[in-house]
UniProtKB/Swiss-Prot annotation:
SMART domains: DnaJ. The lineage of its organism: Bacteria, Pseudomonadati, Pseudomonadota, Gammaproteobacteria, Enterobacterales. Regulatory DnaK co-chaperone. Direct interaction between DnaK and DjlA is needed for the induction of the wcaABCDE operon, involved in the synthesis of a colanic acid polysaccharide capsule, possibly through activation of the RcsB/RcsC phosphotransfer signaling pathway. The colanic acid capsule may help the bacterium survive conditions outside the host. Homodimer. GO terms for cellular component: plasma membrane. Gene3D superfamilies: DnaJ domain (1.10.287.110), TerB-like (1.10.3680.10). Residues 1-6 are periplasmic. This is Co-chaperone protein DjlA.
Length: 273
């Protein structure tokens, strides 16, 4: 409800001692403040919706570009992209839009750097959104169980254009590798015979520490701090409010579950609550 401006204007008019006209002027000023507030909120939602649309299209365009970087796009690549869309629960028009964006990214003249620069401008001041974008691309690159040298090169370009240092990128890469045993984009691995099965080896303490970006020798305070920071950065509702498309909320939830599972394993192995 947008009446706080009028209420404050009324109070100002009364306490000003200017009588009837003081109250009228106060109400008028308050009315203008309320209108400005409404326009500001409309602008926020319009900008946020635009940011979500750009994030959505850029995600699948860049994903298609990464896939194409290996050379020919195989049926397996397309199937893996479809599986990722299933994880996002994309159906109907949303799925058609994702498929079209994926095809655009495969084009030889796809403007990768300009696309990333537009995304970075749209996500200015929202580092957790940028991080989520990179994590989704890492999941896509790792979806077949391996990272092709050309995929790594494209990922370096992505990190560079999004303002992520090489050291930060390597940390994200290690966290992604550790998270694969926690169902974080790597629950299913391709074998040479073309089938898919769950990784036989269960997650280890080393894997869990990679997910949280900590060392096995770190104390409980350091580990808890890293856990809380990551959970805050991957909170689905917060990410959507900042511009993550609602269709991608499921990936954020799965990432948060992976972080939680890793933290629970560390607590169990190191014996703290």
């Amino acid at each position: 409800m947008h009446y706080w401006g009028k209420l404050l204007g009324l109070i100002f008019g009364v306490v000003s001692g200017a009588g009837f006209w003081g109250i009228v002027i106060g109400l008028f000023i308050g009315h203008m403040l309320d209108r400005a507030s409404v326009r500001g909120n409309q602008g926020f939602f319009a900008n946020n919706q635009s940011r979500q649309l750009l994030f959505f299209s850029s995600t699948f365009q860049v994903m298609g570009h990464i896939t194409k970087s290996k050379g020919r796009v195989t049926e397996t690549d397309i199937r893996l992209a479809s599986q990722l869309m299933e994880r996002m629960q994309l159906h109907g028009q949303a799925r058609i839009a994702a498929q079209q964006a994926f095809r655009e990214g495969k084009e030889p003249n796809f403007p990768l750097r300009e696309t990333l620069r537009q995304l970075r401008r749209a996500c200015f001041g929202r580092s957790d959104l940028i991080r989520m974008f990179l994590e989704i691309q890492l999941q896509a690159a790792f979806s077949d169980g391996q990272l092709h040298p050309n995929e790594r090169t494209v990922l370096f370009i992505i990190a560079d254009e999004l303002g992520i240092s090489r050291n930060q990128f390597e940390q994200f890469l290690a966290m992604m590798e550790g998270g694969r045993n926690f169902g974080d984009g790597g629950e299913w691995q391709q074998r040479q015979y073309g089938g898919y099965q769950k990784a036989a080896q269960g997650p280890t303490l080393a894997d869990a520490c990679k997910v949280l970006g900590v060392r096995e020798k770190d104390d409980a305070t350091t580990i808890k701090r890293a856990y809380r920071r990551l959970m805050s950065e991957h909170h689905p509702d917060k990410l959507v409010a900042k511009g993550l498309p609602p269709e991608m909320m499921e990936i954020a939830k799965q990432k948060a579950q992976s972080i939680q599972a890793a933290y629970d394993l560390i607590k169990k192995e190191k014996g703290f609550k």
